[in-house]
Structure formats: C-alpha cells, structure tokens
Regions:
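Extended hydrophobic leader/signal-anchor segments used for secretion and membrane insertion
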Residues: 2-484
Length: 484
C-alpha cells in the first residue's frame, strides 16, 4: 500500500500521467473542433500536479459510512459520465424493436452502432441522463432538460452515408408527440390528420371531398383545416391523448432503416421497384412484401420456423390472412400444397396517409414520386405543385417561417420563388416494404438526425422463444455490411 501511494506521489510519474491525459484530451478537442474545452485543462493539471482541489475529500472522512457511500457514488458518477461520453462520441447499443427491416435485421437483434463512421454529432441537448433516450424509467418523465439547446454540428467521421447503408437515425416526425403512453410511438401528424378527416366525414355523410377536383390552394387550405381540427381534438382530450409535446432532434426516438436515396438524387417507386435518376436500384436480398395467404389447414410451427415467420407476422392469420414474405419464402410456401391453397401479392391503393400529408399527390406505397431529395447548397424552384413536399424541410428542419397565400409562397415574410437548402437529406425505407413506417409516410431524413451506422450484431434473441432456445447463434457477431 505504501509503495502504491509513493508511486502516486512520484513527481515524474504524475507529470507523465498529466502529459498523456492532456495530449489525448487536446487531440479530442482538435477532432471535435471545440476550443471551449480548453477550460478543462487547468483542472486536469490540478488532478495530477497541484492537487489544490480535494477531488476525493470523502477518503479522509473519519466516518466509515460516509467513506462507503461516497465511494459508491464516486464510482457511479464516473461510470455514468464515461458511458455518456462513449455513447455520445463513439458507439452505442441499439435493439431492433420491430420487423420493418426483416429479414435483413430481425426483431431482437442487438446492434453495435458506430458514431465515428459518419462522424458523431456534438451535443445538442447536453443535459441528458446517460443510458436514456427521452424518458426516465419508473418515473415516466423527461430524462433531459431542454435548456441549453446547442446548434447542430458534427465531428469528422470515417465516411458518409452511402446508398443502401443501414442507418440509425432520429425519427423525423417525432418532433411532436402525444404524451399518453399508448400514443407516444404513433406518428402525431398522421393521427391529427386522421382525426380531423374522421370528424369531417362524420358531419358529411361519411364522405370526404374529392381533392383532385380542387385547386392546389383549395387542397392546401382543406388539409390544413383537417390538421388543425385533429390537433384541436387531441388538445381537448388530455385523458385520452395526454398533452401535445415537442422533442429536440437528438431526443427523438431512434429508428433504423436502409438508405435508398441520397441527397440530389431523384427517387421514384414503380411497381415496388425503387428507381434513382431513372435507374433501378438493386433490391435487398431478403426484401419482403405482403401476400394474402389462404390455407387449407393451420400452419405447422415447424413450417413457420423454416420460413422465418414470426408470431408478430402471423397474428392476423387463421385459415387466411396477410403475411410478409421474401421471394424464397413465397416459393417454399407454394410448394406446401397440402397446407397452402393460394399466395397472392397484395396491392394497396391507399393514398391518404402517404407523404406529403398536406398535399394530394395520388401516390401509394408501391408507386411513389418522382421526388427530388434535397441537397445542401442546391437551389430548388418552388411551385404550388411541389411546396407540400418541401414545406417540412424548409419550415421544420431548417427553421423558416413559410406561408402560402393566394397561390404565392412566402418565406420569412418575403415572397420566394427559389430556396437553397442548408442541409443534406436522405430517403430511408425498411426491407419489409409493406410493413415499414418510413420515408414514404413521413418524408426526408435531415442530416442532423443521423445517429450512426450499425457495425455488427453482438446479440440476437428470438422474442417468440424463451431461454437458450431463442438465441440465434448464427447471427452473433455478424457484420451488418454483409447483409445486402
């Protein structure tokens, strides 16, 4: 013990520790380009050299209980600060909560997500409890304090988001939520529009007007009224919906999807196939679509396991129903003629809940666009036919006031015929194409929402099986880049 204390007090040893710690810290400051951090250097000097501040005062306390309790507090605080720092700048854990990326990434996959692949964001909401996204467990309250809010900046990374990368990002439409637990995960805007349109239909014989017969200004005014009415319904029913609350960009729910469109590209979906600048983009190997399956008898559990059909997928299936299937699964299912009567691809003509919600484009999830994806520094001509698509990036993500009056567009009080974007945007979709809430429903993902890149699956457990039988051994430490 005496030898250890002597070593700790050895001036040469202390100066060496100080030099190493300071060099590493200065390199970190160079990387994140944050010179405010230099104010910490005198404190590092004090820890190793001058020791004027009693950083561990409790060690000298005569009270055993004080020393015991404070030693645990010290260890806990150090651990939380270390975890906060590592998660913020280097990597974090992410678990796949739904089947939107199946069969590429499965429900129950735990991902190692790298922040340095695309460069970590500097703190935007710095006063946040480590190991939480937005809510404190048990207490069910915010795990962050909204003040201060720092502007978006990103340190340099090893690369940029590339086409077909699987990406973790903050859910863009999560900027506004209902605080009632059963509604927090829902798209607030789809909920508000749906409630407003439902209320309108109730007072008009169950029908909505034919938007295609309206002018673009009339369409816009009608849909704006539907949203306002829906929001009013939510606001006036706190017992059902809770309160309407805004969340900062970095405190919104984390999503994981595949990037299928890059800044500056023109995307169009034709008969389920994604085209970029007129060329078909390769589908993921395990892309899934919904099929209507008619059975002759109940599907055996062995066949479900063989085809990778989860209980989440089959909840609506009795003797007939809908299943998300890969091409290989469709062929295998059709081969079991003793169980399966027919398998038919589902064509959903629904247009009302497709982005943009404030404009009538007549697009569906399988036939969408064309739509140009905004690029930083690129200038777009604004028209009444495209303003519904780009209003959200201009107004919400880039912080401008946008108004449309008498067919004219005003940005920050001035008539605008062009707009130059301040950020890059991306188009994200799930590989489970008919069971994924993605850019087709809520639009572009701005660059300041990008969290990181999944590197590998460090753990995987099938939620349909318990104990060791649910461990997917073949997926452990599988690299995500190898999942195409």
């Amino acid at each position: 013990m005496a030898t250890k204390e002597k070593k700790e007090l050895n001036p040469r040893c202390q100066w060496t520790k100080f030099a190493v710690a300071t060099i590493l810290y200065l390199l970190f400051l160079v990387w994140v380009e944050s010179w405010w951090g230099l104010i910490v250097v005198p404190f590092i000097f004090d820890v190793y050299i001058t020791k004027k501040i009693k950083w561990q005062w409790w060690r000298e306390s005569p009270n055993d209980a004080t020393r015991f309790i404070m030693s645990w507090v010290d260890a806990l605080v150090f651990a939380l600060v270390a975890v906060y720092f590592i998660n913020l700048f280097f990597f974090q854990n992410y678990v796949i909560p739904s089947s939107s990326l199946e069969k590429s990434l499965l429900t129950g996959d735990y991902l190692f997500v790298s922040k340095v692949s695309y460069g970590p964001r500097k703190p935007q909401t710095p006063l946040t409890m480590p190991l939480t996204q937005h809510t404190l467990p048990v207490f069910d309250c915010d795990s962050y304090i909204e003040w201060p809010q720092w502007k978006y900046e990103r340190a340099k990374g090893f690369g940029h988001v590339e086409l077909n990368d699987i990406v973790v990002f903050n859910y863009p439409a999560g900027d506004t939520i209902c605080t009632a637990p059963q509604y927090q995960a829902q798209d607030f805007y789809r909920l508000a529009y749906g409630l407003g349109e439902g209320a309108y239909a109730q007072t008009h014989g169950g029908y909505l007007p034919n938007l295609s017969k309206m002018t673009l200004q009339q369409q816009r005014d009608f849909l704006a009224q539907m949203y306002a009415d829906g929001r009013r319904i939510i606001d006036s029913n706190p017992s059902e919906y809770g309160h309407i609350k805004a969340r900062p960009a970095d405190r919104r729910e984390n999503y994981v999807k595949r990037c299928v469109g890059l800044p500056g590209q023109t995307l169009q979906i034709k008969n389920r196939i994604i085209y970029l600048d007129g060329k078909a983009n390769k589908e993921p190997d395990n892309v899934q679509y919904s099929y209507y399956v008619k059975l002759r008898s109940q599907m055996p559990l062995e066949l479900m396991d063989e085809l990778g059909i989860s209980m989440e997928d089959i909840t609506s299936l009795n003797t007939s129903g809908y299943l998300p299937l890969t091409n290989a699964s469709v062929k295998a299912l059709k081969a079991h003629k003793d169980v399966v009567e027919s398998v038919t691809l589902v064509n959903d003509p629904t247009t009302w809940d497709i982005y943009p919600l404030n404009g009538n484009k007549g697009w569906t999830r399988d036939n969408y666009g064309p739509v140009w994806i905004p690029k930083k520094g690129a200038t777009l001509k604004l028209t009444m036919s495209n303003i519904a698509i780009y209003e959200r990036p201009i107004r919400v993500y880039e912080g401008n006031d946008l108004q449309v009056k008498d067919g004219k567009i005003y940005i920050n009080g001035k008539e605008a015929k062009y707009y130059t974007f301040k950020m890059d945007y991306y188009w994200m979709q799930g590989d489970n194409r008919h069971n994924s809430l993605d850019s087709r429903y809520w639009g572009f993902v701005p660059e300041d929402h990008i969290v990181g890149k999944p590197i590998f699956i460090w753990w995987s457990h099938d939620p349909d099986h318990s104990g060791f039988s649910g461990i997917r051994w073949s997926r452990l430490f599988r690299f995500v880049d190898n999942i195409k």
